[in-house]
């Protein structure tokens, strides 16, 4: 539970002391008032509070009023502290989890299931909030109960100890039920994560559902997910809900046992017995709260444990950040670079090559051949399993990741936009990027004329799915985003694969203009995209099968030659 409670022992301790003080005030009030009631019945002016200490009836009433005021004040303070404690813990946990994820390496992030982060930040964190509330309630109730029991023992030791012993004995009978609550909590946590990831996957098929008319089948799949998750939640809630009724039944049996014990011991102090029974009945409510808190913690703990595991995984997966400045990127060299995923599946085998400064290089090859992995290595998203990658003769793994990200940028095949304006999407949270730099990047990407035609200009709102922009405009916006910090190496993945003729022409024009100022690497399946390349490399089965000029490669490499033929370019 360290992710939620951590080093907050001082706050919990303050709540415990406050609850103990509140419990003592309540216990003393119950003793004084119960004995005052017996004094009125017996028509006496003096009452015994604890031991031989006596008070007048009026004094007892004043003490009772004082105890009410003290208890109310302490309870209000505890409520304020508890609510502040709970909300701050949840907020801090969400910040910590989000930061750990965002700074985790790309391989760690990519290994997450769809919707996992959202589920951790919502359902799992809310369960953590419930756990924190349960812990604070349990601590408060426990110390209030201790205060009440202490007062009861001081008033009538025999009856109080009998009740306490019976309550502990009966309470131990609930241990198997609490274990069942925890097991069902684990099942519910796993079901919730599966529901979130599966639903996220389905939600991404919106267009396909309409195209293939599979709404009924998708609805059935969602229904199965809902039913499975609901069943797990129902079993957990049932196990939680029966803890308190069972405890109450056992506690009442303990009170009956106490009466029997007092009768056997021939206790004759009726006033003391009445005070003890009143305290014990009040203590029963605290006992119920403790049992309720315990079962709630048992149900929420699996969620919190899973959240802690993921948080530790994100932190452990934080990518190493070199300290050396990048300086000039220059030539990019790969020396015997190999890469294997965690399942030991090798996707690149001893790739060696050099991409010269201001050279335009194409990458082609069959799907699954290793092109995407090679690009991720160049971007610094992954580190080679063997070999090295050098920029201007220096290992990029030793360089600052932040500076490398400004010098080496990427345009993905699919545009990813955020809710905001056109300017917001070009800037993309980089607060140091000026409006002048944004306008310059838009001109380089041949997007400025389109923006000028918008009534709102750069303030035109753009949805996360690209609303208000065509596909070509979205792609050019992503190109402007990549150019806004004046990179030295630009990598593009299928930049024109799904564009109209005009947008494709504009992007090709941009690349021709940029080739005079920076190194460009283009991953492409469409051979027409590569006619601006100085050299082209062929990646097949994780190996570099060819790296030469287009004319030489068409004669020496069978894959490239066949691709040109199939494209009608040869």
Regions found by a protein language model. Give the residues of each.
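ABC-family ATPase nucleotide-binding domain "signature/switch" substructure
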Residues: 409, 414, 425, 444-445, ...
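A hydrophobic transmembrane-helix motif
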Residues: 28-33, 70, 136-178, 234-277
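ABC ATPase nucleotide-binding domain helical subdomain, centered on the C-loop/LSGGQ "ABC signature"
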Residues: 390, 398, 423-464, 517, ...
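Transmembrane helix-loop-helix hairpins at lipid-water interfaces of multipass membrane proteins
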Residues: 15-70, 153-158, 267-270
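Juxtamembrane loop-to-helix connectors within ABC transporter transmembrane domains
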Residues: 4, 82, 102-147, 204
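Cytosolic ends of transmembrane helices, especially the final helix of ABC transmembrane type-1 domains
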Residues: 210-214, 238, 283-310, 320
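An intracellular "coupling" helix at the cytosolic face of ABC transporter transmembrane type-1 domains
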Residues: 5-9, 106, 123-131, 183-184, ...
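Helix-to-loop junction immediately C-terminal to a conserved catalytic motif
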Residues: 379
């Amino acid at each position: 539970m360290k992710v939620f409670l951590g080093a907050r022992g001082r706050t919990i301790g303050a709540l415990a002391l406050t609850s103990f003080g509140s419990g003592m005030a309540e216990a003393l009030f119950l003793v004084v008032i119960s004995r005052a009631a017996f004094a009125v019945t017996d028509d006496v002016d003096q009452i015994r509070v604890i031991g031989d200490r006596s008070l007048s009836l009026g004094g007892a009433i004043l003490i009772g009023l004082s105890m009410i005021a003290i208890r109310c004040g302490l309870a209000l303070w505890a409520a304020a502290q508890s609510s502040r404690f709970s909300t701050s813990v949840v907020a801090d946990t969400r910040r910590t989890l989000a930061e750990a994820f965002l700074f985790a390496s790309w391989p760690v992030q990519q290994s997450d299931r769809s919707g996992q982060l959202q589920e951790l930040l919502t359902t799992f964190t809310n369960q953590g909030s419930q756990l924190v509330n349960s812990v604070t309630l349990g601590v408060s109730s426990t110390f209030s109960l201790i205060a009440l029991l202490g007062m009861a023992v001081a008033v009538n030791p025999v009856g109080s100890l009998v009740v306490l012993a019976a309550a502990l004995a009966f309470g131990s009978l609930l241990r198997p039920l609490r274990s069942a609550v925890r097991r069902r909590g684990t099942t519910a946590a796993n079901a919730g994560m599966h529901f979130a990831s599966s639903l996220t996957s389905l939600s991404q098929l919106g267009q396909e559902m309409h195209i293939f008319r599979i709404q009924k089948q998708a609805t059935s799949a969602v229904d199965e997910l809902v039913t499975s998750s609901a069943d797990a939640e129902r079993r957990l809630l049932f196990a939680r809900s029966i803890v308190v009724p069972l405890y109450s039944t056992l506690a009442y049996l303990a009170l009956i046992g106490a009466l029997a014990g007092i009768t056997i011991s021939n206790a004759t102090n009726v006033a003391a017995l009445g005070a003890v029974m009143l305290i014990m009945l009040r203590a029963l409510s605290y006992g119920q709260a403790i049992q309720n808190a315990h079962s709630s913690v048992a149900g929420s703990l699996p969620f919190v444990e899973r959240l802690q595991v993921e948080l530790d995984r994100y932190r452990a997966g934080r990518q190493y950040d070199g300290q050396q400045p990048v300086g000039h990127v220059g030539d990019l060299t790969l020396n015997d670079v190999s890469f294997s995923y965690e399942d030991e599946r090798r996707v690149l085998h001893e790739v060696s090559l050099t991409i010269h400064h201001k050279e335009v290089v194409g990458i082609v090859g069959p799907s699954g051949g290793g092109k995407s992995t090679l690009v991720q290595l160049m971007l610094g998203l992954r580190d080679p399993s063997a070999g090295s990658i050098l920029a201007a003769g220096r290992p990029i793994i030793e360089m600052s990741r932040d500076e490398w990200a400004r010098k080496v940028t990427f345009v993905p095949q699919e545009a990813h936009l955020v809710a905001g304006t056109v300017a917001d999407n070009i800037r993309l949270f980089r607060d140091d990027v000026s409006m002048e730099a944004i306008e310059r990047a838009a001109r380089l990407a041949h997007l400025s004329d389109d923006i000028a035609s918008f009534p709102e200009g750069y303030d035109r709102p753009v949805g996360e799915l690209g609303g208000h922009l065509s596909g070509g405009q979205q792609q050019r916006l992503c190109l402007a985003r990549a150019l806004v910090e004046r990179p030295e190496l630009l990598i593009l993945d299928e930049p024109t694969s799904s564009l109209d003729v005009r947008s494709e022409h504009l992007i090709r024009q941009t690349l021709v203009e940029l080739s005079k100022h920076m190194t460009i690497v283009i991953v492409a399946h469409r051979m027409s995209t590569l006619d601006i390349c100085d050299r082209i490399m062929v990646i097949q089965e994780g190996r570099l099968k060819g790296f030469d000029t287009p004319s030489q490669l068409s004669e020496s490499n069978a894959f490239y030659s066949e691709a040109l033929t199939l494209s009608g370019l040869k």
